[in-house]
């Protein structure tokens, strides 16, 4: 019973890509700079799999006998956002980035949105999510108008206090925006950003929801379902793929809930793919430049590795990777264009294999398809022959 378990540590990059300067990301190194800022920092279980052995990795102890195979992957797609990264992991490479709005959205888009939802909006600026609710939260509570904002990524975000606009109504507003944002304005994601609290102490909740574009081509998940496999999704995977190519999914409250749900699915009898996204690294710490918080979240995940390994079956293939960077040590609060780590482990797979620098995240999709015996036109190159 063959299964591939892919765990994406959202934003856990490991050093600037050669084209990082084009994205304003020179010097970004999410994992390396966290270790540099915290001299005694270590991730012993990830290091035992080969984290410190990866070409170009700094700040982590190389293992003399890594349990797994290890490498790093470059992003071939144009962009550095969640959707682009996950689609590429699933074998779909984008040759042009999603549109971004450094000056806010065009007036005609905002007017169409306001007309459709029957109310005015606030904001329409690029901003940090925590800062925008500090700035406009009181006015929102007073007027009832939702807050629209964006970032350096291709996102249309709508923030609303849960007592002012009920969460289900906020989700409906997001669906409306998603239907409007097509063609040249087809942003990667529309995101619901509910918050609670009182003036001066507003706090975002875990009821965030992403409304992604449907993938523009077939992904590993589509091929897997077509071939009769189960595809189980944990976290925001279902949202990222617009629900396509997924047979069962569960949303999560935080990283540790995500690991719990992953373990539950691992204990199920099924053949196919388990795809998990753990978003706290990015959402709670990377974007907020919280080095200590990010480091603690990494340690929390690292402590769960023995549990994950203990629940692997004989034919399971485990892949741990990331979708982009979000270096909390830099001035930027946005994603960074970085290499991502690649750790691969399974009871019947070789240990201590250096997979080198892969030219695309899509090598994961090609390898998983190869392992499951799926014929596909996916991008990427399989490394199965190196590890089996």
Swiss-Prot record:
Belongs to the phosphopentomutase family. It is found in: Cytoplasm. The keyword Cytoplasm applies. Keywords: Cytoplasm, Isomerase, Manganese, Metal-binding. Mn(2+) 1 binds at residues 10, 323-324. HAMAP family: Phosphopentomut. The keyword Signal does not apply. It comes from the Bacteria. GO terms for biological process: 2-deoxyribose 1-phosphate catabolic process; 5-phosphoribose 1-diphosphate biosynthetic process; metabolic compound salvage; nucleotide metabolic process. CDD domains: PPM (cd16009). Its EC number is 5.4.2.7. GO terms for cellular component: cytosol. Mn(2+) 2 binds at residues 282, 287, 335. Its cofactor is Mn(2+). Binds 2 manganese ions. It comes from Acetivibrio thermocellus (strain ATCC 27405 / DSM 1237 / JCM 9322 / NBRC 103400 / NCIMB 10682 / NRRL B-4536 / VPI 7372) (Clostridium thermocellum). Its main location: cytoplasm. InterPro entries: Alkaline_phosphatase_core_sf (IPR017850), DeoB (IPR010045), Metalloenzyme (IPR006124), Phosphopentomutase_DeoB_cap_sf (IPR024052). One of its GO terms (molecular function) is manganese ion binding. It catalyses: 2-deoxy-alpha-D-ribose 1-phosphate = 2-deoxy-D-ribose 5-phosphate; alpha-D-ribose 1-phosphate = D-ribose 5-phosphate. Pfam families: Metalloenzyme. This is Phosphopentomutase. Isomerase that catalyzes the conversion of deoxy-ribose 1-phosphate (dRib-1-P) and ribose 1-phosphate (Rib-1-P) to deoxy-ribose 5-phosphate (dRib-5-P) and ribose 5-phosphate (Rib-5-P), respectively. It is an enzyme of class 5 (isomerase). Pathway: Carbohydrate degradation; 2-deoxy-D-ribose 1-phosphate degradation; D-glyceraldehyde 3-phosphate and acetaldehyde from 2-deoxy-alpha-D-ribose 1-phosphate: step 1/2.
């Amino acid at each position: 019973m063959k299964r591939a378990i892919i765990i994406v540590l959202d934003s856990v990059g490991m050093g600037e890509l050669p084209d990082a300067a084009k994205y304003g990301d020179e010097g970004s190194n999410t994992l390396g700079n966290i270790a540099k800022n915290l001299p005694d920092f270590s991730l012993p279980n990830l290091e035992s799999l080969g984290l410190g052995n990866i070409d170009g990795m700094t700040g982590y102890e190389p293992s003399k006998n890594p349990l797994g195979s290890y490498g790093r992957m470059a992003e071939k797609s144009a962009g550095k956002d969640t959707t682009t990264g996950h689609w590429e992991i699933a074998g779909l490479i984008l040759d042009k980035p999603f549109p971004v709005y450094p000056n806010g959205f065009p007036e005609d888009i905002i007017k169409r949105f306001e007309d459709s939802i029957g109310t005015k909006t606030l904001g329409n600026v690029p901003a940090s999510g925590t800062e925008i609710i500090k700035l406009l939260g009181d006015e929102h509570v007073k007027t009832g108008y939702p807050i629209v904002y964006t970032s350096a990524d291709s996102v249309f975000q709508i923030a609303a206090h849960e007592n002012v606009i009920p969460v289900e109504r906020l989700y409906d507003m997001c669906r409306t925006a998603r239907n409007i944002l097509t063609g040249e304005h087809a942003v990667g994601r529309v995101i619901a950003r509910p918050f609670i609290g009182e003036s001066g102490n507003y706090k975002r909740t875990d009821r965030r929801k992403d409304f992604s574009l449907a993938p523009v081509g077939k992904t590993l998940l589509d091929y897997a379902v077509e071939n009769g496999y189960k595809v189980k999704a944990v976290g925001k995977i279902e949202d990222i793929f617009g629900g396509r190519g997924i047979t069962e999914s569960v949303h999560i409250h935080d990283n540790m809930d995500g690991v719990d749900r992953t373990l539950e699915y691992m204990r199920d009898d099924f053949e196919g793919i388990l795809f998990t996204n753990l978003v706290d690294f990015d959402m709670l710490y990377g974007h907020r430049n919280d080095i200590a918080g990010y480091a603690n979240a990494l340690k929390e995940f690292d402590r769960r590795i023995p549990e994950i390994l203990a629940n692997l079956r004989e034919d399971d293939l485990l892949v741990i990777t990331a979708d982009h960077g979000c270096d909390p040590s830099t001035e930027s609060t946005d994603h960074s264009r970085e290499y991502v780590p690649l750790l691969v482990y399974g009871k019947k797979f070789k240990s201590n294999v250096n997979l080198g620098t892969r030219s695309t995240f899509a090598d994961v999709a090609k390898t998983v398809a190869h392992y499951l015996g799926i014929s596909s036109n996916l991008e990427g190159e399989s490394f199965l022959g190196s590890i089996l």
